[in-house]
Amino acid sequence: NLRGAMSDYDLALDIDPNNFIGHYNRGLLRARVGDDNRAIEDFDFVIQMEPDNMMAIFNRALLRAQTGDYRGAIKDYTTVIDQYPNFLAGYYHRAEARKKIGDKKGAEQDDFKLLKAQLDKQNGGTNKDVAQNQNKDKENQNGENGDESEEGKTRKKSDKNMNNYRKIV
């Protein structure tokens, strides 16, 4: 019974209006029943009390986008992405909001970030792994670690060294 829960939150917040957890939960509930503008007000209160609450900021961003406030949504998505640069949902939603306001370049940058992350995931590596492999390749080409792998761009079929699997047979 969502309406009953809503009246319970209203009553609880009448008793303790500064309870930001109550505002957060009521904001989620209001969003669930489609009362987006009042849900945004609840998340505004939570963010005022706890400016680093990234979940409240992200939820407000989603609601702002739903109500057509794309610039406000982009600002909130950017805040979350700045704090958590690997939060891919933030890039996806920001790209969608940027498309809505005609910021093609910004949307393409976010889409590129998503594509790059998907490729890294498919290839089983992260940016850190890719950088480490590039450093190993440079070391191998410079003759360092010569025991571990052969120099150059080719490898033998019998070579079992995983660092050489990117080389031509």
Residue ranges of predicted features:
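Alpha-helical tetratricopeptide repeat
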Residues: N1-V169
